[in-house]
């Protein structure tokens, strides 16, 4: 997940209200993201799931 070095034309801009980009990983396979998208608040990590969030509304 790149927050500040955007690679055109592939970046995503998040909509109002869900303006943080995030990626979700399973802790057992940290190299393979399970899900990515936009969210309003960065979720807390758990024993099974790790979240990586940007504090911007644009990301790759």
Swiss-Prot record:
Specify the effect of residue 4 to H.
In toxin CM-8A
Check the record and name the InterPro entries matching this protein: Cytotoxin_Cobra, Snake_3FTx, Snake_toxin-like_sf, Snake_toxin_con_site, Toxin_cobra-type
The yes or no answer to whether the keyword S-adenosyl-L-methionine is present is no
**Origin, by domain of life?**
Eukaryota
The subcellular localization recorded is:
Secreted; Target cell membrane
Cystine pairings recorded for this chain: 3-21, 14-38, 42-53, 54-59
Q: Which residues cross the membrane?
A: none
| Gene Ontology cellular-component annotations | extracellular region; membrane; other organism cell membrane
Looking up Gene3D superfamilies in the UniProt record yields: CD59 (2.10.60.10)
Q: How does it assemble?
A: Monomer in solution; Homodimer and oligomer in the presence of negatively charged lipids forming a pore with a size ranging between 20 and 30 Angstroms.
Family the entry assigns? Belongs to the three-finger toxin family. Short-chain subfamily. Type IA cytotoxin sub-subfamily.
Q: What does this protein do?
A: Shows cytolytic activity on many different cells by forming pore in lipid membranes. In vivo, increases heart rate or kills the animal by cardiac arrest. In addition, it binds to heparin with high affinity, interacts with Kv channel-interacting protein 1 (KCNIP1) in a calcium-independent manner, and binds to integrin alpha-V/beta-3 (ITGAV/ITGB3) with moderate affinity.
Q: What is this protein called?
A: Cytotoxin 3
Question: Which organism's genome codes for this protein?
Answer: Naja annulifera
């Amino acid at each position: 997940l790149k927050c500040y070095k955007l690679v055109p034309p592939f970046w995503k801009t998040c909509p109002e209200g869900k303006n943080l980009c995030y990626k979700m990983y399973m802790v057992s396979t940290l190299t393979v993201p399970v899900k990515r998208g936009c969210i309003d608040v960065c979720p807390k990590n758990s024993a099974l799931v790790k979240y990586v969030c940007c504090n911007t509304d644009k990301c790759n």
